[in-house]
């Protein structure tokens, strides 16, 4: 009747079809879950320096340094379909040149086996908070937002924003010392 290769091909095709159906069922079982969490964020020790921006032609730029406290519980997000979270803190503000400026100042990968309740105190920025001009000084509406990507085992990569945002006014004078 059928030779060995034909039977192996049929078995492999059926197995792949069943695995695809199970993967789709896994995705559909978690697609409608709510992945938003609330956080408690405090930003303090904000200092702004006017530095030379070597990436542009002899222009000055504002460099902000700050520390923040973050408390958030991600434990309810980890179901069987969540592999890990990519968590990052974004500073958003408007300037004369750009309607929206978004700067990622800190990030962390949170895996299932790690601590999923974050209680960070006095964390410094991981990346430079550099504005391409002098728009940070005296800015009264810099919004800090915690966002995270939910990385699943099966399904699409979900971008989620935390429910709480923090609006912070920036200092009115530059810091002149070299120490942060």
Curated annotation (Swiss-Prot):
* Keyword set includes Heme: no
Q: Which residues cross the membrane?
A: 13-33
Q: How does it sit in the membrane?
A: Single-pass type II membrane protein
Name any Gene Ontology BP term: signal peptide processing
Signal peptide location: none
Q: Does the keyword ATP-binding apply?
A: no
Q: Which residues lie on this side of the membrane: Lumenal?
A: 34-180
Q: Which keywords does UniProt give here?
A: Endoplasmic reticulum, Glycoprotein, Membrane, Signal-anchor, Transmembrane, Transmembrane helix
One GO CC term, this protein: signal peptidase complex
Q: Where does this polypeptide localize?
A: Endoplasmic reticulum membrane
Q: Which residues are glycosylated?
A: 141
Q: Where is the major localization of this protein?
A: endoplasmic reticulum
Q: Which residues lie on this side of the membrane: Cytoplasmic?
A: 1-12
Q: Which family does it belong to?
A: Belongs to the SPCS3 family.
Query: What does the subunit comment say?
Result: Component of the signal peptidase complex (SPC) composed of a catalytic subunit sec-11 and three accessory subunits spcs-1, spcs-2 and spcs-3. The complex induces a local thinning of the ER membrane which is used to measure the length of the signal peptide (SP) h-region of protein substrates. This ensures the selectivity of the complex towards h-regions shorter than 18-20 amino acids.
Q: What does this protein do?
A: Essential component of the signal peptidase complex (SPC) which catalyzes the cleavage of N-terminal signal sequences from nascent proteins as they are translocated into the lumen of the endoplasmic reticulum. Essential for the SPC catalytic activity, possibly by stabilizing and positioning the active center of the complex close to the lumenal surface.
State the protein's name. Signal peptidase complex subunit 3
């Amino acid at each position: 009747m059928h030779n060995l290769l034909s039977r192996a091909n049929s078995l492999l095709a059926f197995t792949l079809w069943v695995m695809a159906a199970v993967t789709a069922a896994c995705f559909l079982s978690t697609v409608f879950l709510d992945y938003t969490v609330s956080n408690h964020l405090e930003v303090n020790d904000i200092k702004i320096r006017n530095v030379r921006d070597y990436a542009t032609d002899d222009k000055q730029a504002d460099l902000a340094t700050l520390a923040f406290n973050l408390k958030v519980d991600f434990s309810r997000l980890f179901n069987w379909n969540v592999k890990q979270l990519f968590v990052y803190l974004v500073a958003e503000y408007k300037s004369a040149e750009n309607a929206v400026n978004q700067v990622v100042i800190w990030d962390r990968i949170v895996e299932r086996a790690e601590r999923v309740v974050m209680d960070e105190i006095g964390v410094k920025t991981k990346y430079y908070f550099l504005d391409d001009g002098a728009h940070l000084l005296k800015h009264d509406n810099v919004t800090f937002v915690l966002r995270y990507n939910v990385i699943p085992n099966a399904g699409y990569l979900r971008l989620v924003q935390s429910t709480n945002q923090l609006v912070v006014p920036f200092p009115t004078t530059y810091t002149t010392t070299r120490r942060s």
